Swiss-Prot record:
Source species: Gallus gallus (Chicken)
Mitochondrial matrix face of the membrane: 46-58
Gene that encodes the chain: MT-CO2
Upper taxonomic lineage: Eukaryota, Metazoa, Chordata, Craniata, Vertebrata
InterPro entries registered for this protein in UniProt: CcO_II, CcO_II-like_C, CcO_II_C, Copper_CuA, Cupredoxin, Cyt_c_oxidase_su2, Cyt_c_oxidase_su2_TM_dom, Cyt_c_oxidase_su2_TM_sf
Annotated binding of Cu cation A2, by residue: C195, E197, C199, H203
Lipid bilayer topology: Multi-pass membrane protein
The protein's name: Cytochrome c oxidase subunit 2
Swiss-Prot/TrEMBL cofactor(s): Cu cation
């Protein structure tokens, strides 16, 4: 999760998030190159090494037409690739349904007969020492590590949004409509998210907690809750 005064992304814990971080760095390098070029040209103008009386420069016009096109291609190609990856739904090992309410989440493990629960934020007065304020819940989502997970997302009342930054996931929860997303966790851990669509007075009290565990631990947990 994010640390105090952190300026960058959270540690990537899924292949999609790793791609997003790489694309962010790539876009920043392109922006840095553009800013450097503009600064260089401004410096030349201020030092009067470039004439402001030029009325015709076919070569310059050709350059400032081709160069932006190249920049756009450099940004568009990796962006389109990531968009395709984010929309692609692999054959999942586990399907989870998330239903947004004012102001809590309901989760249903559709591959199991009787495995569903409501997930409420843990009140500050009940937080154990060392836990995170406004981010902990009474029931976490538990998923197997390194397994394709599909999440079907909807809402029961108003618009919500199911978002977990470390996994690179953010999908709107819309009443009467099913949206879906997928991800794979690359390491064990606990990943925090929140509802990312303003949904009323207690919008900030809808945390999401995903716990990624080895398969045998997930099987033990699911057997315990199903029994």
């Amino acid at each position: 999760m994010a640390n105090h005064s952190q300026l960058g992304f959270q540690d990537a814990s899924s292949p999609i998030m790793e791609e997003l971080v790489e694309f962010h760095d790539h876009a920043l390098m392109v922006a840095l190159a553009i800013c450097s070029l503009v600064l260089y040209l401004l410096t030349l103008m201020l030092m009067e090494k470039l004439s402001s009386n030029t009325v015709d420069a076919q070569e310059v016009e050709l350059i400032w037409t081709i160069l932006p096109a190249i920049v756009l291609v450099l940004l568009a190609l990796p962006s389109l690739q990531i968009l395709y990856m984010m929309d692609e739904i692999d054959e999942p090992d586990l399907t989870l349904k998330a239903i947004g309410h004012q102001w809590y989440w309901t989760y249903e493990y559709t591959d199991f007969k009787d495995l569903s629960f409501d997930s409420y934020m843990t009140p500050t007065t009940d937080l154990p020492l060392g836990h995170f304020r406004l981010l902990e819940v009474d029931h976490r989502i538990v998923i197997p590590m390194e397994s394709p997970i599909r999440v079907i997302i909807t809402a029961d009342d108003v618009l919500h949004s199911w978002a977990v930054p470390a996994l690179g996931v953010k999908t709107d929860a819309i009443p009467g409509r099913l949206n879906q997303t997928s991800f794979i966790t690359t390491r064990p851990g606990v990943f925090y998210g929140q509802c990312s669509e303003i949904c009323g007075a207690n919008h900030s009290y809808m945390p999401i907690v995903v716990e990624s565990t080895p398969l045998k631990h997930f099987e033990a947990w699911s057997s315990l809750l199903s029994s």
